[in-house]
Amino acid sequence: MKIDAILSDYDGTLCPTSSISQDNSNSSSRIPERLEKIIWNISEKIDVCIVSSKDFSFLHRRTKFAKILSCIMGIETLVLKRHKLKAVMRENQYDNDDDSNNKNINNKTNISFGECKDKLQCILSSHIPSNKDILQDNSRLLDSLADEISINFKNITIERKFTSDNQILAGITIDYRHLKEWQSYKRKTEPLLKEMIQRNIQSSSSYELYVQTYSTHPFIDVYSVRCDKGLAFDATIAELACFNADDDRRQSILYLGDSENDNLAFKRADVSIGVCSDKRLNPKLTCQYLVQFNQLSIFLKRLQYNNFVFSDKLLLNL
């Protein structure tokens, strides 16, 4: 089977879960350089798209190779112009993709990809399928909920996720992955967090928020509307079809993901591969194949060298 496009999650798939920084700075939470180079090379041959719970502001700086960004679990999907490669100085957390747990915070590298200076004129189109009145109403509720959680749970961080125009708060992530004993925190404290969220939802809104929990991952996501990776996958494929209208052949899609919220996308893909980037996590994935994070770049390079014709052999002896 020849792969026509690659759709991928970001957090935990292209960048290890343990490396995602809460400062949201441009130098943090980057794809390891070796893997990033390979993905850039692939994007010159076939479409590469990101399907993520992260927002546009976070993803745009880190995934300039992407043709389409489906952000905040599909709440907003953007089609982008192709960025040009440019070498600039940046700080990278990782020397390479050999071991996701070996941080090298002080490592300096002279390569960064796809520097964008067009002040977001790279956006060809943006699509938000949900009712904007509901999004606006629940934006205020999400902001209030984030503040209340921050006051009552001092040792967690809150990531606010905005639409690309920064006008609507469409989701929040309640994150405690930075805690040394986060597994204990998940067992003992996460249930209290869930109770607070549900009380807030029941007492404050005519439009119910959507809560995404995980069996082993150290965070909770709350969104302004119901959303999932299946809908995000469908939105991405629909946008791709518009750009390939002259080709009536059905495209074959490879999907990469790492958590339970990727399962709906796994089911839609022709080839689905789960990526394991943290040994402490044991999510229940419905993918066809599993690879370790430090094997991903090897597999993708093999796929490229094989002219994007997928076979099981590409996953042997990684």
Where are these regions (language model features)?
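Mg2+-dependent phosphoryl-transfer enzymes with acidic/Ser/Thr/Gly-rich catalytic loops
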Residues: Y223-L318
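Active-site phosphate-binding/coordination module
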Residues: T17, S29-D97, N106-R160
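A short acidic/small-residue loop/turn micro-motif
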Residues: S21-N24
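Short, well-ordered alpha-helix to beta-strand connector turns
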Residues: I3, K45-I46, A66, M73, ...
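Asp-based phosphoryl-transfer active-site loop
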Residues: D4-S19, F266
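Conserved acidic, metal-coordinating active-site core of Asp-based
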Residues: S144-L254, E260-R268
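Short His-Asn-centered micro-motif
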Residues: S8, V51-K54, L256-D258
